[in-house]
């Protein structure tokens, strides 16, 4: 990602739903047929124009899905973590190339399997697991649709301060959030917060200062303690 890129309206990180109700045996059998790869932080796994033929499963770490405009602006469509599928639309809608960026947010281990190979396995060794895997993917797609609808409503009806407050409360429910004697401790930069709510970095900083003055949180550097959220 070039340093000059700017990021606009985004969805927030959602609660990861580990395995999406898939049992350990199903996951183990799925992973046995997949290729595991490790990626460093902030690595583009694929970009627009790359061949679209692979389903990804996040074993560990966190990734983002990003739409990129011609002027290098970026729209973060979502953050996804351990136990979630990425690139699942290709199982149902045929497309030759990718239209978005898959970028790691942390060090990640991903399981990768081609759509063609997975469809073959659904007819053979993964036949008993196929309904469970497809149902889990359907649940995931439904959650993402609901999340997108909720975020669109926030952008339409809430001001920046309200969006930041709600986003911080969303982040407080994430596995990365840490318990704190006064509430919940988050690690989020002003830039990342701006990307999550669709405002400038400067605006995000001003809102955090206001919320701190109002006694709702304490912010220092990338650390935010959100009071009363344990």
UniProtKB/Swiss-Prot annotation:
NCBIfam families membership: PRK11753.1
InterPro entries attached to this UniProt entry: cNMP-bd_dom (IPR000595), cNMP-bd_dom_sf (IPR018490), Env_Response_Regulators (IPR050397), HTH_CRP (IPR012318), RmlC-like_jellyroll (IPR014710), Tscrpt_reg_HTH_Crp-type_CS (IPR018335), WH-like_DNA-bd_sf (IPR036388), WH_DNA-bd_sf (IPR036390)
Location relative to the cell: Cytoplasm
Superkingdom: Bacteria
Domain HTH crp-type: 158-230
Single biological process term from Gene Ontology: regulation of DNA-templated transcription
Binding residues for a nucleoside 3',5'-cyclic phosphate: 18-139
Regulation: Allosterically inhibited by cyclic di-GMP (c-di-GMP), which binds to Clp and abolishes its ability to bind its target gene promoter.
Subunit record text: Homodimer.
Molecular functions per Gene Ontology: catalytic activity; cyclic-di-GMP binding; DNA binding; DNA-binding transcription factor activity; protein dimerization activity
Annotated organism of origin: Xanthomonas euvesicatoria pv. vesicatoria (strain 85-10) (Xanthomonas campestris pv. vesicatoria)
Annotated Pfam families: cNMP_binding (PF00027), Crp (PF00325)
Biological role: Global transcriptional regulator that regulates virulence factors production by activating or repressing the expression of a large set of genes in diffusible signal factor (DSF) pathway.
UniProt DNA-binding residue ranges: 190-209
The protein's name: CRP-like protein Clp
Keywords: Activator, Allosteric enzyme, c-di-GMP, Cytoplasm, DNA-binding, Repressor, Transcription, Transcription regulation, Virulence
PANTHER family: CRP FAMILY TRANSCRIPTIONAL REGULATORY PROTEIN, DNA-BINDING TRANSCRIPTIONAL DUAL REGULATOR CRP
Presence of the UniProt keyword Transcription regulation in the record: yes
């Amino acid at each position: 990602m070039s340093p000059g890129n700017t990021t606009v309206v985004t969805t927030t990180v959602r609660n990861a739903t580990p395995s999406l109700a898939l049992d350990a045996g199903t996951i183990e059998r799925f992973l046995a047929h997949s290729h595991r790869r490790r990626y460093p932080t902030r690595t583009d796994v694929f970009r627009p124009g790359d061949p679209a033929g692979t389903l990804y499963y996040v074993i560990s770490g966190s990734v983002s899905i990003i739409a990129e405009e011609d002027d290098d602006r970026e729209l973060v469509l979502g953050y996804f973590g351990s136990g979630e599928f990425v690139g699942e639309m290709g199982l149902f809608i045929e497309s030759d190339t990718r239209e978005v960026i898959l970028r790691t947010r942390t060090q990640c281990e991903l399981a990768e399997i081609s759509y063609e190979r997975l469809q073959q396995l659904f007819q053979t060794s993964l036949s008993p697991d196929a309904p469970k895997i497809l149902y889990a993917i359907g649940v995931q797609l439904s959650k993402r649709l609901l999340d997108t609808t909720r975020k669109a409503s926030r952008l339409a009806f809430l001001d920046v301060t309200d969006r930041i407050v709600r986003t911080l409360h969303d982040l407080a429910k994430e596995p990365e959030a840490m318990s704190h004697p006064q509430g919940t401790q988050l690690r989020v930069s002003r830039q990342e917060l701006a990307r999550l709510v669709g405002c400038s970095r400067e605006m995000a900083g001003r809102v955090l200062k206001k919320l701190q003055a109002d006694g709702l949180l304490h912010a220092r550097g990338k650390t935010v303690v959100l009071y009363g959220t344990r």
